[in-house]
Curated annotation (Swiss-Prot):
Subcellular location: Cytoplasm, Nucleoid
GO cellular component labels: bacterial nucleoid; cytosol
InterPro entries the UniProt entry points to: YbaB-like_sf, YbaB/EbfC
Domain of life: Bacteria
Name of the protein in question: Nucleoid-associated protein AFE_1920
Pfam families for this protein: YbaB_DNA_bd (PF02575)
Family statement: Belongs to the YbaB/EbfC family.
Function: Binds to DNA and alters its conformation. May be involved in regulation of gene expression, nucleoid organization and DNA protection.
SUPFAM superfamilies named among the record's database cross-references: YbaB-like
Self-association state and partner proteins as the record states: Homodimer.
Keyword DNA-binding: yes
Length: 107
């Protein structure tokens, strides 16, 4: 019995190490979000750190600040959804599809 419990604990520790490594890798993975037919593009990590915002120059000459703000927000939301999807897929690979209670993705 003791050997079985020790083996389970060892496997749990290995899983925890793999999860931590995957989280560290995801912090470097970049995803994009787009809005307005790609007139606005947001690049962020799977940790939700925004790295870049690209705005097509044509949006800057038109003077519609509210529309531009809406497009930036939509592009950020698109990037967040993509980051969450990529994170969930990567973590699922590590856990073999098990849903581990209390594990909030991405971090």
């Amino acid at each position: 019995m003791k050997g079985g419990l020790g083996n389970i604990m060892k496997q749990a520790q290995q899983l925890q190490e793999r999860l931590q490594k995957t989280q560290e890798e995801l912090a470097q993975v970049e995803v994009q979000g787009h809005a307005g037919g790609n007139l606005v593009e947001v690049t962020m990590t799977c940790r939700h750190d925004v790295r870049r915002v690209r705005i097509d120059p044509s949006l800057l000459t038109d003077g519609d600040q509210e529309m531009l703000e809406d497009l930036v927000a939509a592009a950020i939301n698109d990037a967040v959804r993509t980051a969450e999807k990529v994170s969930a897929e990567r973590m699922s690979e590590v856990t073999g599809g098990m849903n581990i209670p209390g594990m909030n993705l991405p971090f």
